[in-house]
Curated annotation (Swiss-Prot):
Official protein name in the record: Tityustoxin-19
PROSITE patterns found in the cross-reference section: BSPN_CSAB
Signal peptide annotation: 1-25
InterPro entries to which the protein is assigned, alphabetical: Long_scorpion_toxin_alpha/beta (IPR029237)
Source organism phylogeny: Eukaryota, Metazoa, Ecdysozoa, Arthropoda, Chelicerata
Further information: The fragments 26-37, 34-42 and 43-52 described in PubMed:18718845 correspond to the propeptide and some additional residues of the chain. The authors do not know if these fragments are the result of the post-translational maturation process, or if they have a biological activity of their own.
Length: 91
C-alpha cells in the first residue's frame, strides 16, 4: 500500500513538473519573440537613420566624399564635394 502511494506521489510530481516545464517553454518562446521584435526594430531604426544621413550627404560632404557620391548615384548623377556642398552632375 505504501509503495503504491509513493508511486502515485511521484507520478503526480512528475506530471506537475511536466506541466510547469511546458508553460515555461511557452513563456520562453514569448520572451524570445519579444527580443527578436526589439532587434528588428533597432535594425530598422539604424537603417532609416543611415538612409536619412546618406540622403542629406551635403552635411557629411567635408568629412567623407563617399556620402556625396552615393547620394548623387541614387539620383543617377556623378557627385563631387566643393566647399561644404555636394554637387550632382547629370550624365
Amino acid at each position: 500500500m505504501v509503495a503504491t502511494n509513493r508511486c502515485c506521489v511521484f507520478a503526480l510530481l512528475f506530471a506537475l513538473l511536466l506541466v510547469h516545464s511546458l508553460t515555461e517553454a511557452g513563456k520562453g518562446k514569448e520572451i524570445l519573440g519579444k527580443i527578436k521584435e526589439k532587434i528588428i526594430e533597432a535594425k530598422d531604426k539604424m537603417k532609416a537613420g543611415w538612409e536619412r544621413l546618406t540622403s542629406q550627404s551635403e552635411y557629411a560632404c567635408p568629412a567623407i566624399d563617399k556620402f556625396c557620391e552615393d547620394h548623387c548615384a541614387a539620383k543617377k548623377a556623378v557627385g563631387k564635394c566643393d566647399d561644404f556642398k555636394c554637387n550632382c552632375i547629370k550624365l
